């Protein structure tokens, strides 16, 4: 529960005209960002324009520019929204009593999201490529990566403390898992006739997590 509290907080608000107006603005911004993610995936960063995002969003140019002044602002906001959505998506994994089950669920939730909407997964390789040449993108992507690694690390630490996992380096172990998480992203780009994302991640996660498990008598 403590891990979840660090990532998710729900506020129950009584509906008001101001609240509804703010909610409408959030919905519009999300529509713009989802559209931007599609444009970024299809055209890349340097070949895409604000006009492309306007067309994809089916909003007026004024509406888009009301929230974002440039394509760089939009794409940086895409990273922020992806991080927020991922935190909410993965929160149930930290609620599992077993760290093993929690990490397995982590993989499963990512695969489920990929199947439902691969928009953000599709543009991740492009965002990493931009980060190599732009410090602002690098800082944003590094922040997302660091928080995600810490989230995984906390679940592993709990497993060690509960004597569910052997004594291992939590940072290295979390990195190992994350490198395999990234394998999911490639299923959003390259299609395989023989292996699907769900089968791949289930088998790979089992291999890794079984190596972490504390065996009886150890």
Model-derived features with residue positions:
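Helix-turn-helix
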Residues: 31, 38-73, 77
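Hydrophobic alpha-helical segments that form the core
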Residues: 168-187, 200-208
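Generic hydrophobic, amphipathic alpha-helix propensity
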Residues: 28-37, 53, 78, 82, ...
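Amphipathic alpha-helical packing segments from all-alpha helical-bundle domains
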Residues: 87, 91, 116-119, 135-162, ...
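Amphipathic alpha-helical segments used for helix-helix packing
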Residues: 102, 114-139, 189
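Hydrophobic alpha-helical connector segments
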Residues: 77, 91-119, 171-177, 198-201, ...
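N-terminal intrinsically disordered/low-complexity leader segments
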Residues: 1-27, 216-218
């Amino acid at each position: 529960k403590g891990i979840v509290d660090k990532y998710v907080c729900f506020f129950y608000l009584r509906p008001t005209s101001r609240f509804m107006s703010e909610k409408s603005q959030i919905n519009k911004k999300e529509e713009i960002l989802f559209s931007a993610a599609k444009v970024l995936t299809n055209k890349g960063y340097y070949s895409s324009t604000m006009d492309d995002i306007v067309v994809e969003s089916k909003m007026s140019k004024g509406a888009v520019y009301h929230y974002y002044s440039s394509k760089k602002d939009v794409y940086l906001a895409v990273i922020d929204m992806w991080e927020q959505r991922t935190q909410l998506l993965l929160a149930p994994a930290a609620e599992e009593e077993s760290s093993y089950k929690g990490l397995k669920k982590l993989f499963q939730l990512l695969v489920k999201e990929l199947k439902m909407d691969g928009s953000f997964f599709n543009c991740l390789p492009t965002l990493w490529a931009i980060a190599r040449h732009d410090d602002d993108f690098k800082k944003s992507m590094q922040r997302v990566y660091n928080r995600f690694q810490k989230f995984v690390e906390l679940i592993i630490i709990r497993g060690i403390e509960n004597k569910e996992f052997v004594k291992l380096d939590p940072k290295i172990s979390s990195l190992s898992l994350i490198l395999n998480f990234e394998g999911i992203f490639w299923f959003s780009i390259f299609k395989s006739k023989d292996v699907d994302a769900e089968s791949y991640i289930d088998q790979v996660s089992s291999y890794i997590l079984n190596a972490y498990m504390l065996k009886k008598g150890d």
